[in-house]
Amino acid sequence: MEKKKSKFKRVLLILFILILLLLVFDVVSTEIKSKKLPHHFASAEEGRELLLSNTEYYSDFSQNDIDYRLKRNGGTLDELLDATTDEIKDFNFFEKYLLDHNIAKMVTKLNKNGYKLPELKEETVYIKTDMKVEGVNAGYTHGTQIYLNSANILVGSIPGKASEYFEHLMWHELFHCLTRNDPDFRAEMYSLINFTVADHDFEMPPSVSAKYFHNPDVEHHNSYATYNIDGKDTDCFLVWICTEDYSENDPPNGFVTDVALVPIDGSDVYYTMDQASNFDEVMGRNTDYVIDPEECMADNFSAAMQYGIDGEEGKGYPDPEIIQGVIDIVKR
């Protein structure tokens, strides 16, 4: 009996060691493969320093930008930055593994399909934040900094739609880093939805600048498309606006946003999406996220990288030529 117990214990020990070795191998191989898309995970301290380095972005904030994020009237930029940096946390080992696993999966798809992305001048830096100040968004970027909602990192470990959503997010945020890094890549991508990139940013007229709501993923307003408005072709750039000031009395209904189509000729007027009869024709119908060509193409890029030309579950796309265009660009 004692011999049987001893043998059983040895078998359990061997199984435990084998499982442990497999886990170690998986973690190490996943990390090695994921490094094909160069990145690192910021500590909370580094993440806070990086966020505070984005002075140009935050210095242009309006009072409305501050109030909506702090969810109260009369806040200051310093208070906003304090609240935003307080949300930045350290990654734990499991979260790093989950992210490396997703990045390794992205690398596999790039290699399998023969896709080549523009090289980044700096590696991407992933930063973990609770994201409450930024409206509980899933993610956003500055430069090559990718800020991820701490709750969504765990969602990425759930098989099925949840993990697919997280993969989409990872591709989407990476796109913003790529377009900042490579102006030619950005121009090519924007051209797929009929946008031309100019050599300068367009000035927002007073009627628009007063309502402009900052999006960290959109660094420039220097691209335009031709919209048919009241039967006339008008070259416009897009601006995300908040049509109402923040109100503590009615916060849920206070955040009303719209997309302003602003003529590039400098006239102090803007139009809405509904006023452009060809808005869907210009932007395509593959995504509803059309507040800016940057966000629209980030979604198209994500779909192309994640599902290819066949689309999710082989269902295709309303405008497959945009997806094919993305594939052609990264396959050259």
How would you name each of these model-derived features?
Residues 32-100:
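N-terminal mature-domain "stem" immediately C-terminal to a signal peptide or N-terminal signal-anchor/transmembrane
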Residues 85-148:
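Auxiliary, metal-adjacent structural segments of Zn-dependent hydrolase domains
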Residues 93-104, 160-165, 169, 288-296:
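Soluble non-cytosolic domains of exported or imported proteins
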Residues 24-33:
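Sec-dependent signal peptide cleavage junction
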Residues 182-263, 294-332:
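Post-HExxH zinc-binding segment in Zn-dependent metallohydrolases
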Residues 268-309:
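Extracellular low-complexity, Gly/Ser/Thr-rich intrinsically disordered linkers
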Residues 2-17:
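N-terminal Sec-pathway targeting helices
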Residues 129-171, 180:
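Active-site scaffold of zinc-dependent metalloenzymes
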